[in-house]
Amino acid sequence: GATSVEYIVSVADYVKEVLGQDIQDLKVAIVHEDGSYGTAVGEGNYAAAEEAGMDIVVYEAYSSSTLDLSSVIMKLIAAQPDVLLLTGYVNDGSLFVRQSAELGFTVPILITHSGGHSVQAFVDAVGDQVNYLLTVDPVPCNPKLDSFSEELQTVFQDFEARWTEKYGVKPAHHVEMRAFAQAYLFFTQVAPLAIEQSGTFSAASCRDAILSLDLDASQSLMGAGVKFSTPDEPFVDPVLGNSHVGQNIEAKAFINQYFDGELYCVWPEEYAQKEPVLFLPSSSSLSAGVVD
């Protein structure tokens, strides 16, 4: 949840140029589905926005099974936020887009958080309105390939070609990219190491191998290194302060954006395939019209 706020802070000068406001003057709305995923992201959004000094004007949870988000959207219309940080799944995510258009809700900056916003079903549901939506994901989608080793560039191109041939669409969403990247990492790094260390291939030997991994970002299609926290060295969340064991402390989140129905990495720069469009343009039904 913190990544979306970090991204906005990183482009503070551009925000000031367009909106005439410093980061501390931005009105931020945080809306999320009320399950464990949405709640965790929302808490991260809130903590990071609060730390950045932003004015949090809406902090609202809803059920992902809802058939009506009009009450939430009316609160947003009343609050007139500069930024909306939104987390949900496919059905509620597409419902939000549809009802926002019906009720006239617009916002200058909208950032979604993976989940249902980064899958083909969401694209199919909202059509062209998906374009220019920003989403925070655990992998860079359609990344700049020279960020990876030559070997991984070849592997990615082969994966993309085979997937596209079989399914008719590119693997341009976090689900496909993450599943392949993790499976490839397991079979090329974890499994061989487990057998080398113990002479066996088992759940226990794989666990030991995983905990001993220390890879840099160039060795993984995840766009991040691999080093897991242990009971002796737990990971402490820098935003929320929670202590975790078994977490990849090198993990990152990335900002992807839809262009012509496909997700492309736009931040951080070393993985960016396209330039980000921070403010929703007039072609979006959610655009507040601050840019053409």
Task: Annotate the PLM regions.
Residues W163-E176, T188-C265:
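Segments of small-molecule ligand-sensing domains
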Residues G1-L103, S147-E150, T154:
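Extracellular/periplasmic Venus flytrap/periplasmic-binding protein
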Residues D22-I23, I77-A79, E102-G104, A125-Q129, ...:
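Extracellular/periplasmic catalytic domains that process cell-envelope and extracellular macromolecules
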Residues K16-Q24, V123, Y167, A194-S198:
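Alpha-helix termini
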Residues E6-V9, S94, M177-T188, A204, ...:
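A structural signal for well-ordered alpha-helical segments within the folded catalytic domains
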Residues G44-A52, Q99-L103, A121-A125, R162, ...:
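Alpha-helical structural signal in soluble globular domains
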Residues G1, S100-Q182, E269-Y271, S282-V290:
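Extracellular/periplasmic periplasmic-binding protein-like sensory domains
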Residues Q24-I30, P81, P140, E165-A172, ...:
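Flexible glycine/proline-enriched surface loops and loop-helix/loop-strand junctions
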